[in-house]
């Protein structure tokens, strides 16, 4: 099997539990790129956070963010693919979340929009510097054009309840994916990491059989199934492990370095 592109989820995969890139992972990524292999991030995070870590690692191709809804060139800052909600859908969605007093954030380009700022609701972003967060208060409707993703944050164990409620209201007008157990990512319909990865592969003229995809969570299932070599972290959920062709070490044990050294 010849691997030409490695796609890495961030939280629980590329990053350890401290939300940092272990040195061994960084060195293994450099070795892979030195061999002419493309290495990218495929994350549910917003573009700015994905780009922040990709630039730290000098990654050599566009990155996939917003669970596949955005594929952005690091050098030009331009999107080679971007999916948006319809204005009607996102307006209705934000309105319902406001009425329910659910804490939400939504992304337009590299900007995060919130009703009010509460950094306790951003635990995954604690190691990303320079985030642009805009507090909009009650006047959200002027910030509903070109929205790529909305995230519901709930630290009280009610994410599944919220997901079921929104699925009942919106049906196939949105995509719903639990991410970390305390957040839920909402995307335009039909979007997942496999979609974003396929757009990147097409851009790079690489066949899916030449892709290695690594992840740990619910939102990684599609790309792990799509890639020629699907890799689960030892800390992955069972659903991911069950479809992966290989299980690597835990994210706190340099699992990405281990799998790169094994297959590259």
Language model features with spans:
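Residue-level signal for inorganic ion chemistry
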Residues: 32, 43, 67, 150, ...
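Mg2+-dependent phosphoryl-transfer enzymes with acidic/Ser/Thr/Gly-rich catalytic loops
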Residues: 1-5, 21-22, 185-264
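Short, structured coil segments at secondary-structure junctions
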Residues: 57-59, 66-67, 169-172, 226-227, ...
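Active-site phosphate-binding/coordination module
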Residues: 18-121
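Asp-based phosphoryl-transfer active-site loop
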Residues: 4-18
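Short active-site oxyanion
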Residues: 36-40, 60-61, 149, 209-210, ...
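Short, acidic loop-to-helix structural element flanking the phosphoryl-transfer center
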Residues: 21-37, 82-89, 130-137, 190-202, ...
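Conserved acidic, metal-coordinating active-site core of Asp-based
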Residues: 96, 100-214, 218, 235
